[in-house]
């Protein structure tokens, strides 16, 4: 018989930098999960990613105090800001443009995000990324 699920915990943790301090410790502690075990497993799985890149994770907590977790792809906004080499998006996105990315950069981001997007194909994913970029005040050339 399958284990009884007692909840899901969604967190965004910098790659390779999970530690017992908030937000990780309190979120896992409430469910009675082993915090250090999660931190070690998360850091081991995110070694290949760029250190410090915010990585969403969904933790499934079971009644016997065990857990599993699934890593998601980094948020599109983080990848777009990195591609445009800016720190933050525009405060007035449709009037003040703060940067630009090319279609090739948008395609790279779309390929990275593809497992988490609902887009049917790469072209639809590129349009989704372009829309996110536009709402941040970033111009996408060639889309």
Curated annotation (Swiss-Prot):
Signal peptide positions on this chain: none
GO biological process: translation
Record SUPFAM superfamilies: Ribosomal L11/L12e N-terminal domain, Ribosomal protein L11, C-terminal domain
Pfam families: Ribosomal_L11, Ribosomal_L11_N
Cross-referenced InterPro entries: Ribosomal_uL11, Ribosomal_uL11_bac-typ, Ribosomal_uL11_C, Ribosomal_uL11_C_sf, Ribosomal_uL11_CS, Ribosomal_uL11_N, Ribosomal_uL11_N_sf
Function, as annotated: Forms part of the ribosomal stalk which helps the ribosome interact with GTP-bound translation factors.
Entry-linked PANTHER family: 60S RIBOSOMAL PROTEIN L12 (PTHR11661), LARGE RIBOSOMAL SUBUNIT PROTEIN UL11M (PTHR11661:SF1)
Protein name: Large ribosomal subunit protein uL11
Organism encoding this protein: Paraburkholderia phytofirmans (strain DSM 17436 / LMG 22146 / PsJN) (Burkholderia phytofirmans)
Lineage per the UniProt record: Bacteria, Pseudomonadati, Pseudomonadota, Betaproteobacteria, Burkholderiales
């Amino acid at each position: 018989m399958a284990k009884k699920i007692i909840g899901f915990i969604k967190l965004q943790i910098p790659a390779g930098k999970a530690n017992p301090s908030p937000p990780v410790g309190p979120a896992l502690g409430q469910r009675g999960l082993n915090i250090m075990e999660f931190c070690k497993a998360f850091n081991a799985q995110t070694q290949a990613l760029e250190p410090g890149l915010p990585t969403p994770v969904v933790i499934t907590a079971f009644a016997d105090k065990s857990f599993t977790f699934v890593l998601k792809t980094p948020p599109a906004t983080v990848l777009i800001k990195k591609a445009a080499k800016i720190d933050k998006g525009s405060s007035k996105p449709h009037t003040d443009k703060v940067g630009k990315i090319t279609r090739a950069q948008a395609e790279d981001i779309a390929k990275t995000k593809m497992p988490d997007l609902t887009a049917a194909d790469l072209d639809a994913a590129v349009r989704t990324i372009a829309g996110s970029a536009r709402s941040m005040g970033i111009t996408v050339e060639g889309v």
